[in-house]
Amino acid sequence: MNPYGNSTLPSGVRSRRINNVNGLTVHLLEAGYEVTGRPVVLLLHGFPELAYSWRKVMLPLASAGYHVIAPDQRGYGRTTGWDDSYDADPDPFRPLNMVRDAMGLVYALGYRSVVSVVGHDAGSPVASWCALVRPDIFRSVVLMSAPYEGVPSLPFNIANGAAPPRPAPTDDEIDAQLAKLERPRKYYQRWYRTREANDDMMRAPQGLHAFFRAYYHYKSADWKANKPFPLKARIADELAKMPTYYVMDRDKGMAETVAPEMPSAAEITACKWLTEAEVGVYAMEYGRTGFTGALQGYRVRRGDDPKSMAELRTFSDRSIDVPSCFIAGKRDWGVYQTPGAVDRMQSAACTQMRDLHLVEGAGHWVQQEQPDEVSRLLIGFLQHQAHVADNREK
């Protein structure tokens, strides 16, 4: 097997494996490991990404005095111990077990807490649950691209006549609405739960490398039509205003969806935030593992999954009470794909929301597109929390 990153990792970022982490052998990248006793920052990637997606911010964080840890999450990359079959039990990918994965890694490395857990895209809900469930371990949280809107509530006071909460439309209900539009559409997260999704992307007619290049380009600030805005409601007519990487044409898979947005040779040459060698890392790793493990989370962590809903209702009415920050690209539709989520995050779900930053010149891949600015924002947030903690101790 080739070295992780195909020699594109920055010097000072190392790759290693840790055994016996909640049933996994976890592959991780780390920086700032040379000095013991440093405060820890845990970085959780999204889909279709890897620990590798954090490579550009790890050294700046390490230079600021942190031990920086970025694992390939369950289902991804070179972390092993999960089943790559669509017919496998998806329960290990449920919210609380993903929290146990994060806890197990922190403990295995000899730490009792981290100063912050940072999650991007599909890593954002995992980071949210970590901060919600174990604030004693995860002392602050930074969410990127995917806002946290809180846990599902248990019906309150219904014995005395109060109306039960009105459930939000499920992905299946939204998908059925989208199918009835004049231009029939489908919701990408609903499609990601299907058996066909893995084969569609693995066997992309354009090849896996070209698939990743087009997919990353289409969701980045380089695709000039990414001009997101708040949607009025989670209904088909509103959701259909988003690009097809989120609300796909009904008759197309993701490979066919992104193919027309393949950048030109000149655009690829001009793309300094994601070189051809770096695209090759994603193509190599996913070419080896497939997408099924990474997609399992969509099957069990969406809001209409009964088991996950029941699991999360244990924390009904509980908020994230550790210091929180939200960072996303200014041209990232992920901020708005769930209407009202940002407002709920700021007003109720996170009681200590310190900052909300929309970064210029970035789409969905904010820490890769604008790593210097993201590093600056992360370090500023972390140093502010350290300053506040120092003042409390005086």
Residue positions per predicted region:
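Conserved beta-strand scaffold positions in the cores of enzyme catalytic domains, especially
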Residues: 15, 68-70, 356-358
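Short, flexible hinge/linker loops that cap or flank conserved catalytic cores
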Residues: 20, 32-36, 318-320
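Conserved HGGG/HGGXW glycine-rich cap/lid loop of the alpha/beta-hydrolase fold
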Residues: 24, 29-84, 107, 120-122, ...
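Short, hydrophobic alpha-helix immediately C-terminal to the catalytic nucleophile
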Residues: 52-55, 103, 128-132, 375-379
